[in-house]
A protein has these predicted regions:
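N-terminal Rossmann-like NAD(P)+-binding domain of SDR-like oxidoreductases, especially those catalyzing
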Residues: 1-84
Length: 84
């Protein structure tokens, strides 16, 4: 059986409202590997964000990286390790 190559995508703010729903939609499609990043800040309820991440992490095609977009070295490393 031929293995289908999945496209890898990056979703920023994956624990927020829009990022969570975008991540869930790509995962539902089954054709994508989703790398979600978020800094889990306290702009609003962090427990809500953590619960969203629990849902996303149930899918083996999802990987979470706790990172802030201002962490330049970590962002560069993420892009060095992944082809998006």
């Amino acid at each position: 059986m031929r293995k289908i190559k999945k496209n890898k995508i990056l979703i920023t703010g994956c624990a927020g409202f829009i990022g969570f729903h975008c991540s869930a939609a790509f995962l539902k499609n089954k054709k994508f590997l989703v790398i979600g990043i978020d800094n889990i800040n306290n702009y609003y309820d962090q427990n809500l964000k953590l619960n969203r991440l629990k849902i996303l992490k149930k899918d083996n095609n999802f990987t979470f990286v706790k990172i802030d977009m201002n962490e330049e070295k970590k962002i560069y490393k993420l892009f060095e390790e992944n082809k998006f």
